[in-house]
Amino acid sequence: MLKSAIEDFEKDRYEEALPLFEKLAREGNAEAMYYLGMMYYEGWGVDKDLDKAIEWWKRANRRGSLDAKYMLQTICSTSSVFARE
């Protein structure tokens, strides 16, 4: 299912990818959590929502996602988002 979700994502079929990533994320899949973060960060198939993006990346990071860790570090170093936490 992850492969299918990533294929949809890479082909800009975000509406098809979203429910697959959500299901996988609920099951604890860190890569799906990372992709959900990207979708919310960029507004791909969903409304842009930095808070949701950060929350998905935090969850993915706790499960060992280096991509999510990178995004969190990037956001932290370029924005004041974390100043309110």
Regions found by a protein language model. Give the residues of each.
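Short coil/turn and helix-start
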Residues: 10-11, 26, 44-48, 62, ...
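Extended, folded domain segments that form the structural surfaces/walls around functional sites
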Residues: 9, 18-19
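Hydrophobic face of amphipathic alpha-helices that form TPR/SEL1-like repeat modules
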Residues: 2-8, 23, 35-42, 71-78
